């Protein structure tokens, strides 16, 4: 170990390359959204911290804010009795769910999220603890850009040739992440950095800029195909911020005006030739801007009902359905569409303040953008970092490991060259201890089974006893996961444990009070063995949906019903007060049953749409009892 007081050499190209490759591995491995990928990334961090430890302590402001976040997150394990009674606890108790004595209703899930909070802070501290000079910064930035361009090119080829990339599970068929907004976040950051590399290379001649400009163009094409407004806004916003920083540095309105004009030209080209992307910006059917605002309203209602320190890490998804009001529909909400609101829900507004202070402490080192400090590269990184922070206000890119690691890395690359302080022996020791801990936790995560998924697999294989045991283990880890209760209820129903199954179905419905697919599937469990319970569950499914969504649900119910006239009569009762559903029933049942209810259906047909009335007339004619047109 180097004695304290000696000046360390700048971080080597190998360390910078390994850090960049780790980020790219996280992105390329499906955004590090699966347990093996998360474990591998955590193990990679551990190796870096152990073999290339931080040589100095980070800035005091970052350390204080980071410690504050850790202490605040640890309040999740304080006794719940120390805080005011929360309404959701009483609601869960009424449903037969007894929350634990801790503030967090899911302490083990909070512990897992706590590990990732420590990992994120440790990653940033390790980056800040290295001595980045201009040469290393340029190398790291070029590696990030090159890796991002390679991933985007792979995504474009896979999209064009219609072949799946192993480890990628995009919900819209493009990009490494399941969520297109997270893929767009990474592509946009890479695009802004590519423009910075082009500007830096321009000092050696315009030909040197061509590879980086081509990379930025390819990333822009990927953003258009990715169909993410957030990614495009991040790219154009980051580019504009970079122009604004250069104009501010030169005190030149001309630079700002020219830069803004170029950005507007790019925006116009995307809107003109970007296909359906313009429709999303114009508020088309796929835009969902209004729905996002409704989610924010309900998230604020949830946050208002929580203690000052939040509900504990990892609990938003479980508690949000209990506070849905403005955003009620058939979409299951997984996150609050804002990193900062998510943080406020789980760590309170104090957590938001501490996180913002930590970001300010890091980005303060980016100023001033003086000549001779590779200001073009740093200005691009600073612009990308600011744009990423703005993006996180209306999306959740920093709650995905792959996109978060890249954003944190970009923040550090924006900082000026360090003044080469003396090496801290304490920083080296702490870094290596954290590396050992990270490797141990990575091994645990790698071997940790996904009991919830295993329970479903075992249930499909009709190994119901083993499936219930796996579900019990999953509920010990996440006791408010309605999906696991539903899985266990189905297993118990198949084993003839009716009362136990009913209790689990009730718990699942309480934890997810709006999704109609839940009671719809419950009815399918009961329809053969307990038809009365199926009718009751399906009645709940109909109650949860409004027109016209109820027609699809009711059609599924009719399709799953047994061939029994008395049962179909009960299903007609579920459609009471919903004329379109009554007509749907009339179209579905055999002629004799339809004829018996012709008078009732005819009376409500006038309340339906013209196409439905015409369909009713045709059906009535087919069964030989056509009434006068209503």
Task: Locate predicted features.
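Alpha-helical transmembrane segments of multi-pass inner-membrane proteins
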Residues: 2-32, 36-51, 66-73, 108-275, ...
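Transmembrane alpha-helix boundary signature
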Residues: 53-59, 75-91, 98-102, 135, ...
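Juxtamembrane membrane-water interface segments that cap and precede transmembrane helices
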Residues: 93-107, 164-176, 290-294, 321, ...
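Flexible juxtamembrane loops connecting transmembrane helices in multi-pass membrane enzymes
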Residues: 172-176, 235-239, 266-304, 321-322, ...
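TM-adjacent membrane-interface loops and short helices in multi-pass inner/ER membrane proteins
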Residues: 179, 293-333, 340-343, 347-354
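Internal/C-terminal transmembrane anchor helices
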Residues: 257-272, 423-450
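C-terminal luminal/periplasmic domains and tails of membrane-associated envelope-modifying transferases
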Residues: 453-630
């Amino acid at each position: 170990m180097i004695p304290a007081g000696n000046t360390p050499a700048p971080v080597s190209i190998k360390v910078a390359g390994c850090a960049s490759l780790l980020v790219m591995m996280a992105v390329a491995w499906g955004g590090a959204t699966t347990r093996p990928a998360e474990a591998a990334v955590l193990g990679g961090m551990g190796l870096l911290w152990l073999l290339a430890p931080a040589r100095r302590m980070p800035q005091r402001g970052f350390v204080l804010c980071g410690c504050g976040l850790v202490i605040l997150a640890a309040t999740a394990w304080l006794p719940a009795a120390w805080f005011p009674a929360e309404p959701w606890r009483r609601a869960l108790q009424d449903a037969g769910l007894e929350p634990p004595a801790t503030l967090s209703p899911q302490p083990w899930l909070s512990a897992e999220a706590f590990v990732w909070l420590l990992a994120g802070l440790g990653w940033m501290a390790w980056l800040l603890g290295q001595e980045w000079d201009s040469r290393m910064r340029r190398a790291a930035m070029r590696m990030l850009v090159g890796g991002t361009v390679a991933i985007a090119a792979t995504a474009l080829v896979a999209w064009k040739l219609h072949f799946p990339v192993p480890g990628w599970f995009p919900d819209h068929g493009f990009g490494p992440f399941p969520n297109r907004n997270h893929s767009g976040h990474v592509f946009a950051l890479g695009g802004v950095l590519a423009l910075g590399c082009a500007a830096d290379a321009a000092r050696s001649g315009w030909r040197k800029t061509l590879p980086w400009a081509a990379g930025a163009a390819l990333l822009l094409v990927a953003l258009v195909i990715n169909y993410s407004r957030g990614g495009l806004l991040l790219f154009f916003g980051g580019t504009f911020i970079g122009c604004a920083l250069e104009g501010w540095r030169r005190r030149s309105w001309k630079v700002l005006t020219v830069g803004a004009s170029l950005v507007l030209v790019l925006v116009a080209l995307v809107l003109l030739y970007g296909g359906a992307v313009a429709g999303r910006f114009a508020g088309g059917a796929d835009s969902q801007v209004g729905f996002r605002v409704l989610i924010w309203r309900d998230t604020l209602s949830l946050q208002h009902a929580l203690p000052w320190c939040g509900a504990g890490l990892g609990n938003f998804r479980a508690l949000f359905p209990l506070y849905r009001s403005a955003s009620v529909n058939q979409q299951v909400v997984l996150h609050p569409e804002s990193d900062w609101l998510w943080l406020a829900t789980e760590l309170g507004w104090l957590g938001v303040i501490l996180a913002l202070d930590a970001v300010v402490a890091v980005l303060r080192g980016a100023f001033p953008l003086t000549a001779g400090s590779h200001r073009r590269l740093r200005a691009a990184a600073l612009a990308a970092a600011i744009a990423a922070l703005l993006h996180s206000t209306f999306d959740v890119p920093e709650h995905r490991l792959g996109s978060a690691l890249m954003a944190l890395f970009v923040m550090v690359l924006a900082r000026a060259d360090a003044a080469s302080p003396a090496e801290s022996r304490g920083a080296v020791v702490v870094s290596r201890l954290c590396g050992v801990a990270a490797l141990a936790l990575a091994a645990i995560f790698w071997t940790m089974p996904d009991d919830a998924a295993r329970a479903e697999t075992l249930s499909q294989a009709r190994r119901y006893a083993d499936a219930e045991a796996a579900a019990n283990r999953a509920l010990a880890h996440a006791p408010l996961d309605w999906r696991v209760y539903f899985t266990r209820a189905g297993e118990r129903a198949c084993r003839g444990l009716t009362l136990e199954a009913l209790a689990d179905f009730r718990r699942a419905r309480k934890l997810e009070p709006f999704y109609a697919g839940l009671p719809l599937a419950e009815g399918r469990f009961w329809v053969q063995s307990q038809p009365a319970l199926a009718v009751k569950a399906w009645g709940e499914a109909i109650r949860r949906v409004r027109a016209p969504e109820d027609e699809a649900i009711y059609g599924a119910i009719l399709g799953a019903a047994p061939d029994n006239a008395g049962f179909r009569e009960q299903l007609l009762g579920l459609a009471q007060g919903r004329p379109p559903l009554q007509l749907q029933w009339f179209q579905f049942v055999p002629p004799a049953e339809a004829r018996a209810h012709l008078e009732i259906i005819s009376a409500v047909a006038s309340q339906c749409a013209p196409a439905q009335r015409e369909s009713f007339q045709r059906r009535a004619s087919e069964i030989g009892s056509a009434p006068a047109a209503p």
